[in-house]
Amino acid sequence: MKKLFLILATALTVVSCHTGKQAGKPMPGADRDRHGCIASAGYTWSKVRKDCVRTFEEGIRLVPAHVKTSVAAYVIFSPDQERAEVFLPGQKKHPVLKRKGGIWKKKQYVLAKNKNGWILKTGGTDVYVSPQK
């Protein structure tokens, strides 16, 4: 009788240890990229800051110049203001523009500041601008 009770108690202990977690379901914060940034918390890697950043908190927000949409682009500057990293919606790679006088450039991208705020141009066309108040 004691052996039967011991076997039942052991079996009950083993069964109760099953946590019921679903296999393959990621835990919160488990979606770190190769730099350790947690995408689900809004972090992405910035080349110019060499750190995980939340573009919507630390960056300059730019809205589409000619299209009425809520999809914004963000610009983050290096600490010395010599480089500007542009975070465009839907793009995994972020171009890094280098300062040349009062503008930042790389290939077709030009970032400049005027009396109304910031303007990001592509191929000479205004694509993103500072939101108007």
Predicted region positions:
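Bacterial lipoprotein signal-peptidase II cleavage site
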Residues: 18-25
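Disulfide-braced loops of extracellular cysteine-rich modules
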Residues: 36-40
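Extracellular, cysteine-rich, disulfide-stabilized repeat modules with beta-strand cores
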Residues: 43-46
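C-terminal partner/receptor-binding element of secreted or periplasmic proteins
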Residues: 31, 111-133
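C-terminal motif of bacterial Sec signal peptides marking the signal peptidase cleavage site
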Residues: 14-16
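Mature extracytoplasmic domains of secretory-pathway proteins
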Residues: 55-100
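Positively charged n-region of N-terminal signal peptides that target proteins for export
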Residues: 1-4
